[in-house]
Amino acid sequence: MDNRPIGVLDSGLGGLTVLKKVIEKMPNESTIFIGDQANMPYGDRSREEIISLTRDSVNFLLSKDVKIIIFGCNTATAVAMATIQKEIPLQIIGVVQSGALAAARTTETKNVAVIGTKATVASHSYLKEIQYRDPEIKVSEFAQPKLAPLAEEDPDEDTKNAVVSESLTPLKNADYDTLVLGCTHYPLLRDEIVAVVGQDKKIVDPADQVAQYTYNVLRRDDLFAESTAPVKHDYYTTGEAKKFTEITRQWMNDDTIVGHHVDAED
């Protein structure tokens, strides 16, 4: 048994979609979330920058004595996870591997589309991971640099619909039956995305698989918290705490949440 918290990081707030699934799956576990809003989006940054920024968030979580770390960010998973996993003793769980597994299991036509940040798409991480599981699957990747900032800004519905429709234009004539939401911000735009691609497409949100895999790892390594241990969820941002708190309360459906500002590199 291990009462230490689960650590979750993201470049911004998208990782809250992963955190929410983790809390639902494991209600007895405490968690610590850090969103690096001061430096988001990661998708347009260089490999070196992404690794450095992700390392800062990892070190922050290590300072909080977490027992496992979830990269609730596809870009960090695709670009930085392999490097940082070699540097720390704790296991890191990433969203790309979980999403790829779900996509390979879901597609019936063996045609999968992936939307993600520029960095995630450029890494071809989903293509590699999906085809590792089934080499016959055709994977089409589409960079969507506007969608993560759009989800963070949370504008009015007309603006969201217009930006999503324009961004997803390349998918309208693409051949696929399964769409992977290759950025943890995208589930926050799920309704707008479905309105463009159609109800007939199967949508893969890696967050569900991440929560299940984390559960499996904790069970395997006997790291579950004791059932009598107090449960606490802490939220940190490198951005502005007040706005972070407002949005986090809305997305997590919890008006008691208080977000805290932190300089992750300190």
Curated annotation (Swiss-Prot):
The lineage of its organism: Bacteria, Bacillati, Bacillota, Bacilli, Lactobacillales. Belongs to the aspartate/glutamate racemases family. It holds the Pfam family Asp_Glu_race. Its EC number is 5.1.1.3. PANTHER family: GLUTAMATE RACEMASE. This is Glutamate racemase. Pathway: Cell wall biogenesis; peptidoglycan biosynthesis. GO terms for biological process: cell wall organization; peptidoglycan biosynthetic process; regulation of cell shape. Provides the (R)-glutamate required for cell wall biosynthesis. NCBIfam families: glut_race. Substrate binds at residues 10-11, 42-43, 74-75, 184-185. It comes from Lactobacillus johnsonii (strain CNCM I-12250 / La1 / NCC 533). The keyword Iron-sulfur does not apply. Keywords: Cell shape, Cell wall biogenesis/degradation, Isomerase, Peptidoglycan synthesis. It is an enzyme of class 5 (isomerase).
